[in-house]
């Protein structure tokens, strides 16, 4: 997974850009976690638990985007996708799935999170 961290020095805001297949991961990190290091620590703990119990699924539910951890696989998806599959919306109103869901390996995801944590703690400097 390719990503780049950015800090807007005028506004003090942090952002992440991910490759096209993982845009939802970047949105999740910015919108659901942001600069909240306690949330970030909670997610990292959840990933550790999933590694210890690979047959079990662990879910972190955000306001708009959620995270599913199962063993070495991480799935990030918009909550609207779960609603959509339950309620079979018309095709014209269906979300473009490739921008609304992404999967990646545990190692790549943990690397993203730990580098984001360092970026935030060092105020946008590595």
UniProtKB/Swiss-Prot annotation:
It comes from the Bacteria. It holds the Pfam family UPF0231. Coiled coil: none annotated. Belongs to the UPF0231 family. HAMAP family: UPF0231. This is UPF0231 protein VC_0605. It comes from Vibrio cholerae serotype O1 (strain ATCC 39315 / El Tor Inaba N16961).
